Amino acid sequence: MPVADTSQLTSGVAERYASSLFELALEQGAVDSVTADLDRFQAMLDESAELKRFVASPVFSAEDQLKAIIAISERAGISGFFANFLKVVARNRRLFALPGMIKAFRVIAANHRGEISAEVTSAHALTAEQENELKAALKGVTGKDVAIAVTVDPSILGGLIVKVGSRQIDTSLRTKLSTLKLALKEVG
């Protein structure tokens, strides 16, 4: 299967699972608690390369994935709908799509609140003040309230990459250095 087909499959799986989780959470009035648990789990993924590898790896059996997810959920204080959701995802061997499920859930929740969703990649964690300034700037551009999901990626070296819908603004130092490198190659 070509890479493009694999990513579309993952995206479709992620959206279906996220949609089901959102509908259940909405029905039970638990969207905020599920979102908080989602944020906690995403923070764990961002901080642990080992957890990222575990989630992405097809090597582990469904039983091993389930045991690990139960232990991780308990340690992180994740309970209720999201803990049960993680168990279903592990049993169905869909952990590889979990990062996409988290993104899709955030988009669905933001749309439900009348907001637009923005994905922000930063070299370092943003302070609450920086997040608020970014939200205000994006609201000024889009005219809507903005829900942001911040991912830390030290490889961008500095600056930000902001994705809103199909638009992307890349002010990362990595991109600027790459552009400079290409310009220097053309000159020399």
Swiss-Prot record:
It is a peripheral membrane protein. Gene3D superfamilies: N-terminal domain of the delta subunit of the F1F0-ATP synthase. It is found in: Cell inner membrane. Its main location: membrane. Pfam families: OSCP. Keywords: ATP synthesis, Cell inner membrane, Cell membrane, CF(1), Hydrogen ion transport, Ion transport, Membrane, Transport. GO terms for cellular component: plasma membrane; proton-transporting ATP synthase complex. GO terms for molecular function: proton-transporting ATP synthase activity, rotational mechanism. F-type ATPases have 2 components, F(1) - the catalytic core - and F(0) - the membrane proton channel. F(1) has five subunits: alpha(3), beta(3), gamma(1), delta(1), epsilon(1). F(0) has three main subunits: a(1), b(2) and c(10-14). The alpha and beta chains form an alternating ring which encloses part of the gamma chain. F(1) is attached to F(0) by a central stalk formed by the gamma and epsilon chains, while a peripheral stalk is formed by the delta and b chains. F(1)F(0) ATP synthase produces ATP from ADP in the presence of a proton or sodium gradient. F-type ATPases consist of two structural domains, F(1) containing the extramembraneous catalytic core and F(0) containing the membrane proton channel, linked together by a central stalk and a peripheral stalk. During catalysis, ATP synthesis in the catalytic domain of F(1) is coupled via a rotary mechanism of the central stalk subunits to proton translocation. This protein is part of the stalk that links CF(0) to CF(1). It either transmits conformational changes from CF(0) to CF(1) or is implicated in proton conduction. HAMAP family: ATP_synth_delta_bact. Belongs to the ATPase delta chain family. This is ATP synthase subunit delta. The lineage of its organism: Bacteria, Pseudomonadati, Pseudomonadota, Alphaproteobacteria, Hyphomicrobiales.
